[in-house]
Amino acid sequence: MIELDAVSVAVPASASTPAASPGAEPASARRRWGRTDHGTPEEITILHPTTLSLTERSVAVIGANGSGKSTLARLLNGLVLPTRGYVRVHGLDTHDDGRAVRRMVGFVFSDAEAQLVMPTPREDVALSVRRTGVERSLRAERVEEVLGSVGLAHLADVSVHALSGGQKQLLALAGVLATEPRVLVFDEPTTLLDLRWRTHVTALLGRLEQQVVHVTHDLDTALLADRVLVVDHGRVVADGTPEASVAAYRELMATRVGTTDEP
């Protein structure tokens, strides 16, 4: 269970580059005048006060570029800490219990290469497996199992640098799955995958027992979730069934680009 209690995220307007702050999305920022808790005369609000209780197994977050959706995702494992309010994951506060939350919440970035630190897929997943405390005699089997689940078993010993962008994203996903987190958060994990692999990964996510939260531009993927949030200019403007939220998102986009097609 994930709870956001009156959570907001802001950066000082005097900062030379707001985007330098983790999760900041200046394209969506709105300036709010008046002193903050820290005495700053003004600040750029990235995410306006948000209260949510996420209990569904699968939650999708959709929105235009710069809407604040990635900031919302990064709040869930403490990559971004709220300026105000509280984020709790299974009862643990991301500020007070940050290390425990990060062990509990696996995160797959859109830039998967940043998560890959070992020379080969086998070694990269093995590193994650070791961190879980799996007995030495069972580690090799677990590595094979995880690589097989994402379709990379046949590439276990090739150089990571030889993998395609899509394969690197699959490897990053494998590394996170190997840690056996209770919650999985994905920030556009299928961006570089072709239709075949996107279908494969989507089916894999549907079989997982963990709670899954994913930021996506793919409305077909969003429709497979149990609940969909629409984020716009740092606010959750729709929250409900996949069909209702996707319809609200299409209508929102239509008012801006004059079409119901995905931008």
Question: Which sequence ranges carry the predicted segments?
Answer:
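Conserved ABC transporter NBD signature motif
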Residues: G85-D96, V101
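Helix-to-loop junction immediately C-terminal to a conserved catalytic motif
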Residues: N77
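Catalytic Walker B motif of ABC-type/P-loop ATPase nucleotide-binding domains
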Residues: L184-E188
